[in-house]
Amino acid sequence: MIHITLPDGSQREFAGPVTVAEVAASIGSGLAKAALAGKIGDKVVDTSYQITQDSPLSIVTAKDADGLEVIRHSTAHLLAYAVKELFPDAQVTIGPVIENGFYYDFSYKRPFTPEDLAAIEKRMAELAAKDEPVVRRVLPRDEAVAYFKGLGEHYKAEIIASIPTNEDVSLYREGGFEDLCRGPHVPSTGKLKFFKLMKVAGAYWRGDHRNEMLQRVYGTAWATKEELQQYLHMLEEAEKRDHRKLGRELDLFHIDEHSPGTVFWHPKGWTLWQEVEQYMRRVYRDNGYQEVKGPQILDKTLWEKTGHWDKYRDNMFTTESEKRDYALKPMNCPGHILIFKQGIKSYRDLPLRYGEFGQCHRNEPTGGLHGIMRVRGFTQDDGHIFCTEDHILAECTAYTALLQKVYKNFGFHNIIYKVATRPEARIGSDESWDKAEHALMESLRASGCEFEIAPGDGAFYGPKIEYTLKDAIGRQWQCGTMQVDFSMPERLDAEYVGEDGGRHRPVMLHRAIVGSLERFIGILIEEHAGALPVWLAPVQVAVLNITDAQQDYCREIAAKLQKALPNQGLRVVTDLRNEKITYKIREHSLQKLPYILVAGDKEKAAGAVAVRARGNKDLGVMSLDAFVDLIAQDIASKV
């Protein structure tokens, strides 16, 4: 007898080997129809998988995350099936699942056109409607190589040839198409109903620029029609909010071909940058951080000690001078330890908090660059806390509360918390890991946060908390981090004198709130669709005249506004052009300015202004003092 244990703890007995599909059918016809795969322990398997021993089993349906993964994987194969039907000369390569979808790479004699994509998607729908069974078979490696060579699929043959000779490989067939794959897959093509092809891009075979350029077709697939429509709507909204488009339209920044992956900030964009940086500088100052500044170029011997030269060298920009090798720093941490090591530190000095707006460089591949979100040169609000194990809980609790306040001030209220715990390969004692993991979790509980645990996802040198923002259209951005580090102080020989008079290693806490300022500003632009809160807006007020008769009055208003607030000048422009007032209002509205002040003869005579708020809201005529009170309240409340 074989005993199958279901998720609710109940058991079912079978006389002999049984498939996942048969177990599902024994539970109910509805479940049998909905079954996409099975999960035995942590392994997801086909519904045709035969269970030969006592096992725990859950039936995977479209409602499960694993089910969605199977749908997307299978839809990638359906895409390849459709391409081979329409373009028999095309060669198939690989087709993995990615976030929110999948892609498949093809080798073909000409680029696919938008019309081709529409035809491929239509053919996919037709093949899905046939509800053809998806059948798995296993071949010895050499036989599989010969099989795909016989089909003229040289890329597939090359992939299989790289597999050890003693391994078998699995193939999946649907209709007239068969593909190499580990699986699992849906039981039939009829399970694939809600998908859309998105775009075509270039991709080098095996990611190597020396190889052939392939065509990568991207698609998305979902469990329901509603989810697909929601996703497509989110993409439409994201396109409107694209920081690259808004950065150009609002004259904030540009990326130039003369320096790929680095940002040229325009005056208005640099004003926004300065507002973010100066705000974070006040956060440092008000929370016990000492701001420091380290050099950008450091000798390779330092990077050898930290392990970066061995593990991360390909992502570092290097140079040579006087027979010494140097690297542009990809991170600030080693520099902060070198500062910590200057002079003797006592336990009374701990916790010691350093903060730096450190400029870092990482040699990201060109294909991975994305506006100001993914760059090669960036500045971090990088902080490091040197402390003892006993300090970790209090420091993490204070940091989480601070992070929540900062995110709220920037307009983010939805934060996802995740604790990444010890991996198998790690340094440090179990006692130290127990203490650190407990401190991270307790700090989140003390802050009233619900959190996920990601077992084994911590770094080899310590556990961490990841803080992820959820934006206005549901996208997630991992920005904040609190990383415990037992390793780097050891590698770089950092010490403090303990209460016992002996030498001790400090624990190092790596922390960032906004992370890369470039990326965070990109997130801000997209979160607010360019309509930044008043306190961040590069231009807060535009003063417009109706006729030349109000020019001097408008200049007078602008001058008063620039001096209206103590310790803070309002950012004001005047527009005195001889243009229709409706034209000028529209132009400044498109720049998403918080306020537009209009002055005609009536306003001039009354010593007042007509106020228009963003979103075409007419607030009527008010005195200049009343307007100053209004905008001061906006700035103070960070709206």
UniProtKB/Swiss-Prot annotation:
GO terms for biological process: threonyl-tRNA aminoacylation. One of its GO terms (cellular component) is cytosol. Residues 1-61 form the TGS domain. Binds 1 zinc ion per subunit. Gene3D superfamilies: 3.10.20.30, 3.30.54.20, Anticodon-binding domain, Bira Bifunctional Protein, Domain 2, Threonyl-trna Synthetase, Chain A, domain 2. It is an enzyme of class 6 (ligase). Its cofactor is Zn(2+). Residues 242-533 are annotated as: Catalytic. It catalyses: tRNA(Thr) + L-threonine + ATP = L-threonyl-tRNA(Thr) + AMP + diphosphate + H(+). Keywords: Aminoacyl-tRNA synthetase, ATP-binding, Cytoplasm, Ligase, Metal-binding, Nucleotide-binding, Protein biosynthesis, RNA-binding, tRNA-binding, Zinc. Zn(2+) binds at C333, H384, H510. Its EC number is 6.1.1.3. GO terms for molecular function: ATP binding; metal ion binding; threonine-tRNA ligase activity; tRNA binding. Pfam families: HGTP_anticodon, TGS, tRNA-synt_2b, tRNA_SAD. It is found in: Cytoplasm. The keyword Transferase does not apply. Belongs to the class-II aminoacyl-tRNA synthetase family. Homodimer. PANTHER family: THREONINE--TRNA LIGASE, CHLOROPLASTIC_MITOCHONDRIAL 2 (PTHR11451:SF44), THREONINE-TRNA LIGASE (PTHR11451). Catalyzes the attachment of threonine to tRNA(Thr) in a two-step reaction: L-threonine is first activated by ATP to form Thr-AMP and then transferred to the acceptor end of tRNA(Thr). Also edits incorrectly charged L-seryl-tRNA(Thr). This is Threonine--tRNA ligase.
